[in-house]
A protein has these predicted regions:
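Catalytic machinery of carbohydrate-active enzymes
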Residues: 1-324
Length: 324
């Protein structure tokens, strides 16, 4: 049996599909697994041992359309469910199952605060697409695999961070997901432990501000490492503090203790850390304004008088980090 899994973006969503790959391999041993994603996210799956072929596109499925048709797939698992993935399904003469995105329910939740979403994690909803071919969930969490060049040697870190540290992920794709810079600096001061800040090049400036405010016990690694190298640093950390972003899901895949911080988005969307390490916590603001503000976190606060982050004090975050 030859199966094509389709998920184009983004990093976190792709990580959340990894149980689908695993259960296909384990429950259909002779299956040939192909995966189609965007080229810029290739590294997330590049070293996955259960993927027989990883296909990528830059923008349009026409880039690989003819080659995919030649593969004669037996089944397509569409975990993106958008116009682009529907074009893939239409190109291939194969049975397909499609993930239900529940866009209407999410719109009702963000617009009117009517929560009609099922109490079910998106991973379990991804896995339900396999029931028609006799494959079931295994309750084993997420997977993440690194290549040899992705591993960051502890001896390559600044002195003081080589024997253990707290990882704080300050990055995030949208502003409504970002715990404020000054509050993050206060968390660093309160925990009194070595801290490595993780994020992309766009987060370097905020990281520098945190180091300036919190002192030499904080190392700003934002933009210094690739995504996979950042995952390697997560692997070496004692605990991970993170916004709702791709590295949060990678940390859960590594079974780290994850302290996840939620602002404009909410765990009820079904995207919380999936089966992370023991002692993980979800922290949300206690505030008068109504969350969620948007599905993606690209909208923040309706009322200028309210700032939801005022309802999540640094002392609360620090206490979660220091908890046994």
């Amino acid at each position: 049996m030859k199966v094509l899994i389709v998920r184009f973006s983004s990093i976190g969503d792709i990580v959340l599909t990894t149980p689908v790959i695993r259960v296909l391999r384990e429950q259909l041993p002779s299956v040939e697994i192909h995966y189609l994603t965007k080229a810029k996210y290739r590294d997330v799956l590049a070293y996955h041992p259960s993927i027989d072929r990883l296909w990528t596109i830059d923008k349009d499925v026409v880039e690989v359309g003819a080659a995919l048709q030649a593969e004669a797939f037996d089944h397509v698992v569409d975990l993106h469910a958008n116009f682009r993935s529907s074009r893939v399904r239409s190109l291939l003469d194969a049975p397909a199952t499609t993930f239900r995105k529940l866009s209407l329910q999410k719109w009702l939740f963000t617009t009117f605060h009517w929560n009609l979403l099922p109490d079910l994690h998106v991973v379990d909803r991804y896995l339900s697409t396999l029931e028609g071919i006799g494959v079931r969930a295994d309750d084993q969490g997420l997977d993440y695999f690194l290549g040899p060049d992705d591993v960051v040697a502890a001896q390559g870190l600044p002195e003081g961070f080589r024997t253990g540290f707290v990882a704080i992920v300050i990055g995030g794709q949208h502003p409504g997901k970002l715990y404020p810079t000054d509050r993050t600096a206060e968390v660093c001061r309160l925990i009194g432990l070595p801290v490595i800040l993780l994020g992309g090049p766009e987060d370097q400036g905020r990281g520098d501000q945190i180091v300036e405010a919190a002192g030499a016990s904080v190392y700003n690694a934002c933009g210094r490492y690739s995504f996979n190298q950042s995952v390697s640093l997560l692997q070496q950390s004692s605990v991970v503090v993170t916004n709702d972003t791709g590295l949060m899901h990678a940390a859960a895949a590594l079974k780290k203790r994850v302290i996840s911080i939620w602002g404009a988005t909410v765990p009820e969307f079904g995207m919380s850390p999936y089966r992370p390490g023991i002692g993980s916590q979800i922290l949300e603001p206690s505030c008068e304004c109504r969350r969620p503000y948007s599905k993606l976190g690209n909208k923040v606060f309706y009322k200028p008088a309210y700032n939801c982050w005022d309802g999540l004090e640094p002392a609360v975050v620090a206490a979660a980090v220091l908890a046994d």
